[in-house]
Amino acid sequence: MSNFLPIPTKAATPLPSFAKHLLDYISAHFRDTHSEAFRKDVDVLVGMRKDWVEAKLEAHPEIIRAFMRYHAQLAFLSTKFPSDINLPFAYYLPFPATFSLSPDAPISLSSLTFERACVLFNMTALYASMAAAERRAEAEGIKRALGYLTAAAGVLEYLITSVLPTLRSELSSPQAAGYDMTESFLGTLKEFVLAEAQECYWQQAVLQGTYKNGLIGKLSMKVSEYYKAALASMNGTDYPSSSYFPLNWTAHMNVKQMHFEAAAQFRLSQEDLEKSRYGEEIGRLKVAESLAKKGLDAARKGVADSVVSDLKQLHAAIKSSLERAVRDNDLVYVQPIPPANQLAPIVGVGMVKVNVPAEVAEPVAWLMGGKAGMEPLFSGLVPYGVHLALSIYDDRKDTLVRDLDGKREELDGLAASTLQSLNLPGSIQALDRPVGLPPSLLKKSEEVASSGGIERIRSLLDEVNRLAHANVQSLNEAMDILDQEATENESLIARQPELQQTRQPSHVANQPLIQMAEQYEATIKQAGGSDATVRAKWEEWARLVGILAAGEMEMEDYVPGTTSPSGSLPPSVRPLRASLEELDDRIAHRARLVREARQISAADDIRPEVLKEAAKLAHGGSGDVKTEWFEDLFEKGLEKYMGVKREMDEEVAKHDELLEQIRTQNESFLSERKDDPIIKERERRLQDMDLAYWKWREIVDNAEEGIKFYNSFAEMLHGFKAACGQFLNTRRIDVGQMTTQFQQQMNVSEPQQQPEPRYQSPSPQSFQPSFSPSPSHFQPSAPSSFSSSPVRSPAPSAPARRESPPKTLSFLPHPSSSAWQPASVDFLPPPPPPPILRSGGIQSQPKVAPPVTPSITAIRDQTQGTPRRMTRAAAAAAERDEATERNKYSSGGPRRKGGGVV
């Protein structure tokens, strides 16, 4: 039986939809590409996973090479796809928790990086298993085992330094991928396989029989140091992993550590004997005997018989040598025996070098070089970095066009508010056309009618209202998840009070999420206020907009005519009318500039240039494509918009001059105009129609900006809800881990130090969305600006991340709801905004009291102090009881069915 321990593998769950999902993703996210063109590549990748990853793993070099090919394909695939393609990869833990509520639940993450990490872990396990299976009684077996172990250490080194940081950046908490994907756990395994590799060097030196005792002792001490480093990593301060290893593993490492330190002292005692240092010989033998005894005591906890047998043989040799040395020294040499702290320390000599296989360290280069025996799959797809670069450029040009349009809207709004304050052009039109309607007004009426009129605004406002309610519902669903976690935690503490010392209360653990929820609720409230302002504005102007959109006949009925002779027009009318016509031309010119910018944007495609630059810089696509490579290309591409931007900037100065000129000319016109009541009324109503046009545009812009805001905000709430779900799953799996740790402590005979809680509440940054739309994007504009500032677009991201659901974890199954609520109970809709802190849980255990159905008032008071949502059933029962208390006849005679008292 081998005295090496094999590392168990992580069993993968099948992915029957792997092929379909890849094809659908290619169809949805890769332009100018037909998914069927890559069906063969998809089938090959799916077949590799099914044949090697999902099958029962056997420790064989060909299996490891197959894993290397699959890992290389995944690494190459990561240059084409984002890590999250909305396809969950599920793996079981290598050491299922013995006392977990559900030890067989796999960990599922939508991450290609997680898939790579699990493949590398299994590669390490296969290397260690092959080393444990080698017969090390001969030099060739030792050499093969040494090669396997150094390769295993190299794969773990690559996993810890290259893959794990990327995986950690994708997760909301460090343990979301499982305890086996933490630096503590992987570092323990790395030091463990290095210890076994060093043990191979020590064994080879012993077998050859040509090395001196001093050198063999130093080799042995280095083995002990590696085992000691493994134990230290296991008990690290950041997320220690000691409770996740089986007891026999911990005992095995303790026994090995003391065994080889004792062996080192024994070898150095032989050297002392050769050099006639008899006192030092006895001192080292005593230290060795003490270590061997401790090792034998620790070996009672499930350590393999072969390991115990080796230690017993060493202990027998030490004991025999110590008896001889003491007898000889007492009778012959009579040298003083130094205490253990005065013996010269043994400095270990390490012979092991971490060997990261080239197939693992440079997987893409190995694949592209043809050494893998297969071509890289999906080589015809454009790299994901190129898609990301194109999305960044598209966002920049869209932002530029939006800025131009925003400046146009700002100038047009300033013109509208200025004309409104001057009562123009109604005052001139009333004099110029005593009957009928001005052509400019008829043109505006036609524009409103052709754009949908009042029905368009109604549909837009209805959509705003629908999206607002959907956002409120999303936030409430997220809070329901936190409520559920708080209830489960209280039920858990009630069942297992011993966990209260090591488990954070819900109101502490979820504090970052609660703070974020408060910010989201405040944003929703602010946006709701803006919605109400826009609706009030629409109610005020709906009648006049309806008249404007109804056409010429309706407007003629509204605008009175006059048959009184107006006489000759004042001389100041002509220059004022010319200025107003110039203002209309300026407005039309700015609209043309925006249309021109949009046409340039529609035809602007720098895809060929980006592909060419990516191929040149990445040397044919053999590595990741970085978006910063294309900054010069972006600047060159945006130069085509500079002409339109310069013209729009010039419009600002000309616009201010023209408005000032109109004000001056209007003052001259007012001083020359003759007042007529009929003309005044016609002037007012013409002005109403003109202002109704501008209000129609303003409300349309407000509603469209509101829709953009709520759509952007919905993405944030979707991510927040996913973060709450991940928080719930993390807390659930933490229950199993803490229960396991507690049970292990109870089963260990020696008293051990009480471990600190492993779980730490996620930081606010862990759940922070990448963008924060503000409700100010849906603010009603003042008369000086009929349109609010344009919505800032979310940060550019891959389409997969924008459209796919968030990452989800499937750690422990949902506990039975009967543990905290009857099966018939259904939860009320969210309470009003003030009790947003309802998910904090109960900070202290309530005292046991006889069950009493509280009144509505009591429940309301309670919800203010205890952030717990009330169920419909509880509310109905309380309502009935309160009504009974109010009715003094309730305990008297019978009731009629209609509710009256007889």
UniProtKB/Swiss-Prot annotation:
<feature type="compositionally biased region" description="Low complexity">
    <location>
        <begin position="866"/>
        <end position="877"/>
    </location>
</feature>
<feature type="compositionally biased region" description="Low complexity">
    <location>
        <begin position="757"/>
        <end position="799"/>
    </location>
</feature>
<dbReference type="GO" id="GO:0005768">
    <property type="term" value="C:endosome"/>
</dbReference>
<feature type="compositionally biased region" description="Polar residues">
    <location>
        <begin position="854"/>
        <end position="865"/>
    </location>
</feature>
<feature type="compositionally biased region" description="Polar residues">
    <location>
        <begin position="744"/>
        <end position="755"/>
    </location>
</feature>
<feature type="region of interest" description="Disordered">
    <location>
        <begin position="744"/>
        <end position="902"/>
    </location>
</feature>
<protein>
    <recommendedName>
        <fullName>pH-response regulator protein palA/RIM20</fullName>
    </recommendedName>
</protein>
<dbReference type="InterPro" id="IPR004328">
    <property type="entry name" value="BRO1_dom"/>
</dbReference>
<feature type="domain" description="BRO1">
    <location>
        <begin position="3"/>
        <end position="415"/>
    </location>
</feature>
<dbReference type="InterPro" id="IPR038499">
    <property type="entry name" value="BRO1_sf"/>
</dbReference>
<dbReference type="GO" id="GO:0042306">
    <property type="term" value="P:regulation of protein import into nucleus"/>
</dbReference>
<feature type="compositionally biased region" description="Basic and acidic residues">
    <location>
        <begin position="878"/>
        <end position="888"/>
    </location>
</feature>
<dbReference type="Pfam" id="PF03097">
    <property type="entry name" value="BRO1"/>
</dbReference>
<dbReference type="Pfam" id="PF13949">
    <property type="entry name" value="ALIX_LYPXL_bnd"/>
</dbReference>
<comment type="function">
    <text>Required for the proteolytic cleavage of the transcription factor RIM101 in response to alkaline ambient pH. May act as a scaffold protein that recruits the calpain-like protease RIM13 via VPS32 to its substrate RIM101.</text>
</comment>
<dbReference type="InterPro" id="IPR025304">
    <property type="entry name" value="ALIX_V_dom"/>
</dbReference>
<comment type="subunit">
    <text>Interacts with RIM101 by binding to its YPX[LI] motif.</text>
</comment>
<comment type="similarity">
    <text>Belongs to the palA/RIM20 family.</text>
</comment>
